[in-house]
Amino acid sequence: MFRKFIFTSAAILAVLGFSACKTAAPEQTPPASVITPAEVSPDQLKKIADVYLKDILTGLETNDYKLFVKDFAREYKDTMNPEKFAPLAAGFQAKNGKLQNLKYLDCLDQGIFKSVVWKAKFTRPKAQEEALRRDGKDPAKIPVPELLVRLLLGNVNGEWKAFAIFFN
């Protein structure tokens, strides 16, 4: 019995000794994105930006956070979380209905960043139509405003990523 006690005690002390020697590895922060100037034709950039914009708009329209942030740089993904996204998407949906028309305008070279610009037209949300009717106005006779959409892109480690989107 005494031998069993000694053996068990030795085993416990050995396990404790090994676990005490183990140090927790510090959490590794991924390196910051390296944005490099990159030559790209406007046609190539437009193709990339069209896909990114479609993902972003679909994410906003359908409350799909993962689709919305899919094409953004890591730094943006680190600051935007589902809790911040929910009111952003709700606000977007309150102001804009479904995308009706999207017209590419141009690419702007802004040093290490490129801006791709479109003119967008959305359907009028139901709540806005109802508000117009309550005010005695016919929604069909009031044009839906167009928006200017600008997507800011940068080349991160050889891959184009979105850094910001602006609706004016």
Q: Model-predicted segments: where are they?
A:
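Exposed beta-sheet edge and beta->alpha loop/turn motif
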Residues: 105-168
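Repetitive helical segments and hydrophobic/amphipathic motifs
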Residues: 12-13
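Short, low-complexity N-terminal intrinsically disordered segments enriched in polar/charged residues
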Residues: 22-62
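C-terminal motif of bacterial Sec signal peptides marking the signal peptidase cleavage site
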Residues: 17-20
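Short solvent-exposed beta->alpha transition segments
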Residues: 50-51, 66-115
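Alpha-helical interaction segments
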Residues: 8, 42, 55-59, 75, ...
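Bacterial N-terminal signal peptides that target proteins for export
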Residues: 1-9
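Short, charge-rich amphipathic segments
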Residues: 25, 62, 66-68, 158-160
